[in-house]
A protein has these predicted regions:
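Phosphate/nucleotide-binding catalytic core
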Residues: 1-306
Length: 306
């Protein structure tokens, strides 16, 4: 779907022009309407499931402090499975999609071990190492400046748009064994989090049921796999990534929060009744566009052309 591609698009623009933003919203709505036509016409692959994953990782130096050398590490590689993340001390590996069945999980594990090894070898050439951990315990607030943001226009544009929407510094309050209350003037707090993210391709007619199942099992899976008790020197939740993920890019003003406006980043608040269309339509209706994008797609013409 064209709209979902745009949501992760690197070629974004930071235009503040209202006309451009309205045109972008119209393009998103056209994409969603084209998606609806595809669902009604049963134009998606069915009867098959695939699984894939992303692995985010930290780059660290000999003292286990963050090593901001990701661009240099990637410059020495020709492996397109490895790419940047928000911070210069993070990398991301995208594993190959596989048919769901047989030894797919073992094959996924084997590839993960192999690609992390590739990253580790390249990192060593820059005097760094790869570490898989939810939140790096040695992170300090001074590591989270814009000087450690990956030099990609997309990230800076997102940072500026979020800050403008927020209308001030980002405020984080997390209470656990200790308490962390801090403000930050950019979105780099989000770079404290890394994770292993599974992607699961299913048929359109089974999407709603399996999406709801995923929401049900999220809590016990997190309870069985927590590993992020420390953030900026404080002992917080056993899985502090949950709290940090929700708060670090919360662009709502205090007035919007008081009125109960839904956060842009959340873990879901309702079941899906019929299809994925419900998610896209609700997001477009509730959230303002942050960034535009130069586009030339015509989804309905593309559908007609096959």
């Amino acid at each position: 779907m064209v709209a979902s591609t745009r949501m992760g698009e690197h070629g974004v623009g930071g235009s503040e022009d209202d006309r451009s933003k309205r045109a972008f919203v119209k393009a998103l709505l056209d994409d969603v309407n084209a998606l609806e036509r595809m669902l009604e016409g049963e134009l998606f692959e069915t009867g098959i499931r695939r699984i894939g994953a992303e692995q985010e990782m930290f780059l660290v130096d000999d003292s286990m402090s963050p090593a901001p050398v990701a661009p240099e590490v990637l410059d020495g590689l020709s492996d397109d499975r490895l790419t940047t993340e928000l911070a210069r001390f993070n990398l991301e590996a995208n594993l190959s999609p596989r048919l769901y069945g047989g030894d797919c999980l073992r094959a996924m594990e084997d590839e993960l071990v192999e690609v992390v090894g590739v990253a580790r070898q390249a990192a060593a050439e820059q005097g760094a190492n790869v570490l898989l951990t939810g939140i790096l315990p040695t992170l300090r607030k001074d590591h989270l400046g814009l000087d450690n943001m990956t030099p990609n226009p997309r990230y800076l544009a997102l940072n500026n748009a979020m800050a403008k929407l927020r209308g001030g510094a980002f405020h984080v309050l997390i209470r656990g064994l200790d308490e962390l209350e801090t403000t930050h003037d950019n979105v780099m707090l989000e770079s404290c989090n890394t994770s292993f993210q599974v992607h699961f391709q299913v048929g359109p007619k089974e999407f709603a049921r399996l999406y709801n199942v995923a929401q049900v099992v999220t809590a016990p899976v997190l309870a069985a796999a927590v590993n992020s008790p420390l953030l900026l020197g404080r002992r917080l939740w056993q899985e502090t990534r949950v709290a940090l993920f929700e708060r670090s890019v919360d662009a709502r003003s205090s007035a919007h929060q008081a009125r109960g406006q839904r956060a842009r980043v959340s873990f879901g608040d309702k079941w899906i009744d019929e299809s994925v269309l419900e998610i896209f339509r609700e997001d477009i209706a509730q959230f303002r566009v942050l960034l535009g994008h130069q586009f030339s797609e015509r989804p309905f013409e593309d559908l007609e052309a096959g």
